[in-house]
């Protein structure tokens, strides 16, 4: 599990984001099959440091046998954090919940045979913390997504719009599942750099998720169409002029 500490340094007027300005500290949890061998999440096979087949062998080691979401949330709360974000699905396409869409999730495809996201969400809400869900826009495992590895591209959207349409339906099905089942306070998207805003259909994404929760917050990784910025790799020395 890779845990990151996120400092909130925003100064926004919108009422819905007041809580995140006051929260200051977030615990962002990366958890997936990459935890089995302790290798880079998704990028290890995308950049071909390891073969895709070897990467997926980690499914057999993902047992979640020592998983105790209540202990996790207790530790998060003791840290002083007021909200937490967890990877519902990273770029490798491995979903932590029992998704009815796609063919790669912890319940159906891993040794654990568990939906590991639901008990974590329940523990977060029971303890009065705000919930954020990380969701990768790219899905490098899905057969109708454009990219598989840095050297393997399945197709171009312009040449095969019908395949992109299939992927879009799959993506929206999964977003609907997460929205309906967990109703997060924050959506933490990632991977927007692979395609343009209109290709991702960012406005539709936001409209659908806001219909479920008008007060939900979006990070900036919807091609800049979010409520706050999320720099990566380092913490700025000076407060950014943009929303952060």
Label for each model-derived stretch:
Residues 7-244:
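Mature catalytic domains of secreted/periplasmic carbohydrate-active enzymes
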